Amino acid sequence: DKKELNIFGRYLYKGYFEEDLDIPIEVNNRLKRTHAWFVSDDDPYIEVSKHLIQQNIYIIADILSHELTHYYLYKHDKPYDDKDIEFYALTYKNGISRTESTIIENGILKYEYFKNESKCDCGFKIESYFPVIDNEFRPVLMCPKCNKPLVYNAIGAIYRDFMPGFKLKMTCDWYEREKSK
């Protein structure tokens, strides 16, 4: 519900930006093409779609944190559009998706990932997935058998369940644990 969403938003904002959130988060039942957006009016606020609040906590946190990043930069008079380097750097630092490529499949939000297969001369191979938007920030993978760098071989793009980064996952898990006390 809206009250819980605002509590969660304040928790995320405090965790990521070490400040108190001072704008409301509204639920807009008419939002269909976007999951959420930051509205920079005279009285700024964040709107989220009804279908977003029906997703799992990690998806809600990822998309809400994306909008909270817009607000944080706006509040501090910094460039806050998706294409701005300040926005890019802050979302990357915090492990938040910049702009998600998603579809809704049977009521579940799916993110687009590049699927890669990396092989080594020694016979070791591994599959990996990276968000389409952040494909240029792939880690260097090393073969655990012979310690050589693995070469990425792109297989294609697929839609699959969201895979939260470590910081986002830990933030959500901690929130859930605290809420259940």
Q: Locations of the language-model features?
A:
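Metalloprotease/metallohydrolase-associated module, dominated by Zn2+-dependent proteases
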Residues: 1-58, 75-181
